[in-house]
């Protein structure tokens, strides 16, 4: 196979996997060829058969007792906050600055914390049931919620893993797959090549380069940052005029952002 032919084959493989991943984790619309997260949200208390990729992702968060996946309504509010044109508009969605937003956040967090109100049942053979109590369904209908479940900031972590596993499964074992929000998978198992990952730090209002991390061999890397680091972050972060920053890392304990560091790499 020529280099051009191999590049074309890899491009098609990546594109097909990326399209499938986008559809599986989509919370806004349904697709004929897959049962996705949107379908699960629209059919609470029904058993659905999903793709193994989505089943595996749901099982991982469920096994880890990661209840942040149930904060779908609050992630939607955060996106509205971050899309605001000014502080006054943003504050309407901010539980730390608006009483109505605080009340809504507390209510969703209370539902999120209680497995009797919302939980996932994963019964094997890719069968999933999102259990939602009558009380939560009534509240969601009153508030106009469209998604109980949302991977939100975690989504690209699972997409990167899926893309990496798909590509490696076809024999491609050199190179890196990364997302602009800080998720990285290195495919190279040879250990013969050194890779570099640039590190940044927010100093005042300026994002500065402060070093480079080098590594070898297969790695999974996550670089969390508590500030907007480019246009893809536009709907995940908001900075008020007083420099207060809102980030996407909401806690299931109270539905609020408690980010304490400007960067974290794991």
State where each predicted segment sits:
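Mature catalytic core of soluble alpha/beta enzymes
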Residues: 1-266
């Amino acid at each position: 196979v020529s280099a051009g032919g191999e590049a074309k084959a890899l491009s098609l493989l990546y594109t097909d996997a990326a399209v499938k991943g986008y559809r599986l984790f989509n919370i806004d619309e349904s697709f004929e060829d897959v049962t996705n997260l949107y379908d699960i949200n629209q059919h609470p208390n029904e058993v659905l058969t999903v793709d193994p990729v989505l089943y595996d992702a749901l099982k991982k968060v469920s096994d880890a007792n990661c209840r942040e996946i149930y904060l779908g309504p609050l992630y939607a509010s955060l996106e509205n906050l971050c899309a605001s044109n000014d502080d006054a508009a943003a504050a309407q969605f901010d539980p730390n600055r608006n009483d109505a937003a605080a009340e809504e956040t507390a209510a969703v967090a209370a539902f999120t914390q209680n497995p009797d109100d919302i939980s996932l049942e994963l019964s094997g053979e890719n069968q999933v049931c999102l259990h939602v109590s009558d009380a939560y369904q009534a509240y969601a209908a009153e508030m106009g919620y469209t998604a109980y479940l949302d991977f939100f900031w975690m989504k690209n972590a699972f997409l990167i893993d899926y893309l990496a596993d798909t590509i490696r499964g076809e024999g491609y074992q050199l190179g890196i797959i990364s997302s602009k929000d800080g998720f990285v998978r290195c495919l190279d198992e040879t250990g013969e090549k050194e890779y570099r990952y640039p590190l940044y730090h927010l100093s005042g209002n300026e994002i500065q380069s402060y070093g480079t991390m080098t590594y070898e061999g297969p790695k999974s890397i996550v670089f969390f940052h508590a500030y907007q680091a480019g246009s893809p972050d536009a709907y995940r972060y908001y900075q008020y005029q007083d420099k207060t920053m809102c980030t996407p890392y909401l806690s299931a304990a109270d539905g609020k952002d408690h980010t304490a560091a400007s960067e974290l790499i794991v």
